[in-house]
Amino acid sequence: VVKSSYSLFSCVCWIGALALTARATELDDQFRTPPQNVTRVCVSLTVRRGAAETEWLERQLERARDIGAGGVLLSVPMTVDEAVWQGLERALERSRQLGLDVGLCDFCVAKEDADKVPRARKLVWSQETVQAVSSNTVETPPQVFTPPPSYRSVAHLAAPDGASDLQPHQLIDLSDTALPTNGAWRVFRFGSVELEPQRIDPFSETALFRHVNQWLFATQKRFARTYGSTLLWVHFSGHSQTEYAWPPDMPEAFLKRSGLNLFRHLPVLAGVPVGGGSTAAFVRQHAARTLRELWRDRCGKTVNELVHEAGLEAAIRIDEVPVEPVEVGRYFRRPILIASAKEEVRDSNRLAAGGARTLGRRFVMGWLAPFETEPSPAAVLLPFPWKHAVDRLLADGATRILLDVGGALSSDEAAFKQLRDGCLYAHRCQVMLQQGAPAGDLLVWSEKSLSSLAAYSYDAVNGTMLADASVREGRIRFASEREYAGLAVAAASLRHADDERMVRTLASRGVRVWLMAEDDASESTTVARFSGTANCVVLPANMRELPGLKPDCVWQSDAPGMQVRFMHRRTAAHEVYYLLNENAEPGSVTCTFRDTGKGAPERWDPTTGEIELLETDVRRDPDGRVTAKIFLGAHDACFVVFDR
C-alpha cells in the first residue's frame, strides 16, 4: 500500500512538473526562441511594373524570410494586367511555402476597368491679387503654376483686397460674372485634382462597393489556394493629413449639415475668415464633420461589410482618415500606427490603439521606416539604431511592426544585419504583446491621452463607439466581449447635450463615472453639472488616482528626465508588464505593480532573451501590490512578468 501511495504521489508530481514544463514551453521558451508564426514582423515591398513576372519578387520574399520577417505587404500598381495577376499568384504560393502571410496594398484595377473607377481627389486652391488698370483690362501677376490634367474647377471667386471683415455677400462668383474694374481684388481659384499615386475614391459609395466586391471576387478566384490562409489582409490608402479630401458631393452634403452655402465660404478653408472668426470656426468644424460622416457611411461601412465578411482583414494608416483615431479600428481591423518622436503623433497612436483594444482587435500595426528614422543620441549603445523607434510604437500600443524598407530589401550586409537584429528583437516583444488580453478595467473617453492617468492601463472610446455598448451589472460591455468597471470622461469630450445624456444614462445604470477637467473655467463648469449625480465623481484637475480604482503601475525615479511608459497584459498564467525608458539617459526606477499573481517578479530582456528573477529591493505590500527597483539603460525596454 505504501508503494502504491508513493507511486500515486510520484505520478501527481510528474503530472505537475509536466504542466509546469508545458507552461514554460508556452511562453518562456517562445520568448527565448520565438515561434515562426504571426508574432513575426511584416515587411512592405513595392512590386513595380514588370517585377512580378521576374524572379526578383521571389528573391525578395526569401530575403524577408531570412531577416526573420513573418509577413509581407505587397504594393502593386493601381492598374494591373494578366501578367501581374499571374506574378502575384506565384508570389502568394511562394509565400505559403516560406511561411509568410501576405497583405496586398489597395484594390488594384484591371486595365479594362481602369476608366470606370473614380479616383480619389483633393481640394487645391490659389490666391492672387489683381489690380484694375482700365475699364477693359486688369493687371495680373504671371502664372507660375499649371494645373495637372486631372484638374477640375470648383469655384472662381473674387473679394475686395484689404477688406478687414470679409463677408459672404462681398464675394463675387467669377464663373458667370466679369471681375469689377474698380480697385484691387483678391482672386481665389478652387479646384480638385487626383491624388498621386492614383487610388480609388473612398467617397464614391456605389463605385467603391462595386469595385471592392469585384476585387474580392477576383482574388478569391485567382488565389483559391492561398486566399484566407496566406493572403490575410488588404491595406487601403487614404488621404494624408496634408491633403484636403474632396468628395464629389461635398457642397451638397455640407449644406444639408450646416445650412450654409459652402461656395460662399470656401476661402475659410484657405485660411481667410469669411464672416468673422466665429463663422469661420463654424464652417471649419462642420466641413470636418461632413467629411467624417461621408467617410463613415461610404468608405468605413463598405470596407467593413465587404472585406471582413469575405474573410480578410483591412488596414489603414490612422493619419489617412478623417475620423478620430480612436474609432479607426471600428471599420479597419488592422489600424496602422505611425512611428514618430512627435508627441501629438504618439498621442494619436495611443488613442487608436486604445480604441482597437476596446474593439478586440488583435493586430495593431506599427509603420516604421527604419532607414529614415533619425537615431537618438544613445543609438551607439543600442543593438540596432532604430530600436527606440520600435519601442515607442510598442509602448503606444502596436502589437505587430510593419517595416517600410523603401520598396525592396537591400543586398547590403550591414543593412541585412540591422534588419535581422531588429526583427528578432521585435519578434520577442510581439510574442509577449500578443499574449492573452489587455489588462485594463478602465475605459477613457477623451480627445487626447490624459497624463493624469499615465499610471493606468486603459482602453479608449468615443461617443460613436459608446453608442454601440451595452451595460450589464454596472459594467460597460462591447460586442468584442471586452468589459469595463468604469468610465473616465474628459470634460472636453462633452461638447453636446447628447454626450452628456449618454454619460448620465450610463451612470443611472450603475456604471462608475469619473469626470475630469483641466484648469479651464468652461471645463470646470461642464463637470460641475454632474455634482451630486449618482455614480458620478467630479475630480480636481491633475488628480493622479481614481477613487476606488488602484493604478496598474506607479513609478518614481531620482534620475533626472526619467520618463517610463508601460503596457499591461494578462494571460491565464502570467501578468505581463512592458516597461520603456523614454529617456536617453540610464537610471533606476522604483515601480509598484498592482496585479502581481504569486508576487515573484521576473525581468525578461527582449534584446538577449534572458530571464532573471528580480530580488533586490523587492517587497510585497499587504494589499498584494509588489514594489521593485529596476535599472533601465538609455532607451531601455524590458518585460516584468509575474506568475499567476
Which sequence ranges carry the predicted segments?
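Short N-terminal segments immediately surrounding and downstream of signal-peptide cleavage
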Residues: 26-35
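Generic short amphipathic/hydrophobic targeting helices enriched at N-termini
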Residues: 8-11, 631
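Acidic/aromatic-lined carbohydrate-recognition and catalytic surfaces
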Residues: 74-174, 178-192, 197-209
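Bacterial N-terminal signal peptides
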Residues: 10-19
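Non-catalytic positions within long, well-ordered alpha-helices that form the structural scaffold/packing
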Residues: 62-66, 394
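Carbohydrate-binding surfaces of carbohydrate-active enzymes
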Residues: 37-39, 43-44, 51-58, 71-76, ...
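N-terminal secretory signal peptides that target proteins for export/translocation
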Residues: 1-6
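Boundary at the C-terminal end of the N-terminal hydrophobic targeting segment
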Residues: 22-24
